[in-house]
């Protein structure tokens, strides 16, 4: 885990240094892009950080979910292998209804409610001793996380201050950075404590995501 984390650090730093040299996508936007290249709106930055947190939480399931079930909850290898499949299946189905939910209730309520649901799911993962209930909890977590990232991309693209392509690429860059950095960090902490305690990082990430959702609500007004 630590070696993977150390290997990802130079990539992240290099990407940050080279980001300002990227060419604008459209020639007609060159002048506007030059003026706003270093002025990413706060709403886009908040969306990017929240996407990082959401992707990191999702990544923790793929990287550590099966190992957590088999080593901490003492599930069989076959049952442990079900974790990510169930989580991904629930996420897929939930994202199919994400757009209707956004149209019905609005983008911010979907993000806030999704954060609460995913937090409840992660609490269940850490609390229940029953393997079946842990699987259900992972499903609840996936249900909550599913609509968050697509909604964040949509909100960033509609920021109105920088081109949609620049906004969504910023969100994507930060989001995939979360997949690179956070799951290995959980492994590093698990080496120094245990996997159960290390996964409390995910609970903290979701709590932070909820707090930022409240900030995003103020910025969106």
Label the predicted regions.
Residues 1-9, 185-206:
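A membrane-interface helix-boundary motif in multi-pass transporters
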Residues 109-124:
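Structural signature of the two symmetry-related core transmembrane helices
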């Amino acid at each position: 885990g630590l070696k993977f984390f150390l290997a990802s650090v130079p990539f992240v730093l290099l990407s940050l240094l080279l980001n300002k040299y990227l060419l604008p996508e459209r020639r007609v936007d060159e002048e506007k892009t030059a003026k706003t290249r270093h002025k990413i709106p706060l709403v886009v930055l908040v969306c990017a950080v929240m996407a990082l947190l959401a992707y990191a939480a999702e990544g923790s399931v793929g990287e550590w979910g099966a190992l957590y079930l088999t080593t901490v909850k003492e599930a069989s290898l076959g049952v442990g292998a079900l974790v990510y499949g169930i989580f991904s299946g629930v996420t897929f189905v939930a994202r199919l209804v994400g757009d209707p939910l956004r149209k019905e209730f609005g983008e911010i309520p979907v993000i806030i409610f999704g954060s609460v649901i995913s937090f409840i799911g992660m609490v269940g993962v850490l609390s229940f001793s029953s393997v079946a209930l842990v699987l259900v909890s992972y499903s609840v977590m996936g249900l909550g996380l599913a609509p968050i990232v697509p909604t964040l991309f949509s909100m960033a693209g509609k920021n109105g201050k920088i081109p949609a392509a620049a906004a969504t690429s910023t969100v994507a860059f930060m989001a995939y950075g979360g997949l690179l950095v956070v799951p290995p960090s959980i492994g590093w902490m698990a080496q120094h404590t245990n996997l159960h305690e290390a996964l409390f990082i995910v609970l903290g990430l979701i709590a932070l995501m909820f707090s930022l959702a409240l900030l995003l609500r103020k910025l969106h007004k």
